[in-house]
Design a protein with these regions (language model features):
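ABC ATPase NBD coupling module
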Residues: 53, 67-84, 104
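ABC-type ATPase nucleotide-binding domains, specifically the catalytic core motifs of the NBD
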Residues: 53, 73, 92-111
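Hydrophobic anchor residue at the start of the ABC signature
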Residues: 144
Length: 210
């Protein structure tokens, strides 16, 4: 599995954000995009997962495992995303949030996958919890478990550690990067913090928009 991003241009109606960018992310690796606010980092992720604001113009291609996915609807792209704010359904328990992500199948298999994820993320005691009662680190774990239960073939990380304190941030980085390696899927991380970089050899700095 590999994720490839070929960008000729990414622009707003009045401003060029990104030009002539080519990334190929190998399985089990995390490539980092760094840039200031407004440099187009999050918009690039939106172009990959299919949620780009229609006001922006993306001229390029997104390939997953050699196949173009930029013409597919978001739900067909097999790309997971972890946001800065761990977006959990507030009307569902933690278990129900996870079950929602599991692909269709028999009930017993789906429940088993959720149970395994709860144990793997060390959040089993929180299965029946209201998401509003979770700490920042717990929310990241639940959101990550939900993203992986959808069985993505690539993972996007939109500054998911930025709201955590320094110690928790380090632990969550290690958890996420380890899971990317274990699942052997490509991951693309955007951040403005150099401490979040998974591998300095896999780092692209975006220029200020102009």
């Amino acid at each position: 599995m590999s994720l490839e991003l070929q960008v000729r241009q990414l622009a707003t109606p009045s401003q060029l954000l990104v030009r002539d960018l080519h990334l190929r992310i190998a399985p089990g690796t995390v490539h980092t995009l760094m840039g200031e606010s407004g440099s187009g980092k999050s918009s690039l992720l939106a172009a990959v997962c299919g949620t780009l604001d229609p006001a922006l113009r993306f001229d390029g291609q997104v390939l997953l495992n050699g196949l173009r996915i930029d013409g597919l609807p978001p739900q067909a792209r097999r790309v997971g995303i972890l946001f800065q704010d761990a977006l959990l359904f507030p009307h569902m328990t933690v278990r129900e949030n996870l079950l929602f992500a599991v692909p269709r199948g028999d009930a017993a298999t789906r429940e088993s996958q959720v149970n395994q994820a709860l144990l793997a993320m060390e959040i089993a005691p929180l299965a029946q919890a209201d998401p509003a009662t979770l700490s920042g680190g717990q929310r990241v774990r639940v959101a990550l478990a939900r993203a992986l239960l959808a069985q993505p073939q690539a993972l996007l990380l939109d500054e998911p550690f930025s709201r955590l304190d320094a110690a928790l941030r380090a632990r969550m980085r290690e958890l996420v990067f380890d899971l990317v390696r274990q699942r052997n899927i490509p991951a693309l991380l955007v951040t403005h913090d150099a401490q979040d970089v998974a591998d300095p050899a896999l780092l692209t700095r975006l220029a200020e928009p102009g």
